[in-house]
Amino acid sequence: MGKRQSRKSNYPLDTWVAFLLYAGVAAATFTIDAASRQVVLWCVLLVLSLVYRQALRGEPAHPPADLGRGAAAGLILALPILLLLQPELTAIIARLLPGQSDAAAFQGLVLIAPLAEELFFRGLLQKQHGLVAGALLYGVYLLLFFLPGVVDFALVGLAVCLAGALFGFIYGYVNERYGLGAAIACHATVNLIVFFMPLVVPDIARWLKAI
């Protein structure tokens, strides 16, 4: 009991409160264009993670090979999804990321999102409240993040929330097993294959099946 209390004392405020701050910004930015809003929300996560940076110290060291294990886990997770659901993914992603150039989508999905989201949800929230809480809140986070694109499509919003919770659980497991860097690598690999590649190569699933 004392050990848990000591761990929590490293945080300037409870991470539930930090998530509510994010939710407030998500609501306040609902009416601005999607691309700008997503950048703002990623920045909010990065700022919150920096505020909590003291809590990231003392993490156990993981060998560099664990980054490869995280990327491999992402590959194993992402390829079946791409092969089975590529047409649906292309349509959904076009709705969730409207008007973004390929370069902007790559920067956001593959570089910024994995870093910002894993630092907060796995490096902070999961560390304080556990794997399940981190996964469930990640599903809610994605629903809020993409809300303008799903507000008229309840089933898409539900799918985003449930898929986010499932991905969050997997990223959380990778984090517990191989460390935060591996979780970031896993997340980046999934985003690259599942969310970015269908945007730039619409027929990629058909090509892969033909190999």
Language model features with spans:
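Juxtamembrane helix-loop-helix connectors linking adjacent transmembrane helices
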Residues: Q54-A113, P148-V156, I204-I211
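Short juxtamembrane and helix-loop transition motifs at transmembrane-helix boundaries
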Residues: M1-K8, P64, E88-Q100, E118-L125, ...
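Transmembrane helix-loop-helix hairpins at the membrane interface
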Residues: A103-I211
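N-terminal, membrane-interfacial amphipathic/helix-forming hydrophobic leader that caps
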Residues: M1-H62, A78, L144-P148, L155, ...
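Hydrophobic, aromatic-rich alpha-helical transmembrane segments
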Residues: K8-T15, A35, P63-A71, P98-A103, ...
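Alpha-helical transmembrane segments and their membrane-interface exit regions
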Residues: C43-A55, S101, V160-I170
